[in-house]
C-alpha cells in the first residue's frame, strides 16, 4: 500500500478518521522496519506500548495511540483542525525515529 497516496486521498475527501488510521498503520510499518517494534498482525496496540515501555518513544507513542484509538475505535469524527494537529504529532514522532 502506498500510504502517502492513500492518506492524502482520504484527507482530500474529508475522511480524516481514515487518514488517521492510515497514518497509524504507516507508523507501525516504519517502526518495525527500524526494529523499534516487532510487528505481528495479531498484536494489539497495548502489545506495542509494552514493547516500548522503557524507551524514549513510549510517551509520544502512547499519545499517538490514544488519539488513534479515540478516533478509530471510538468512531469519533475528526475535524480538519484536529486532523492537522494529529498529523503534525505523527510527523514529529516519525522524524524522531
Name these PLM-found stretches.
Residues 4-97:
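Membrane-proximal, non-transmembrane interaction modules
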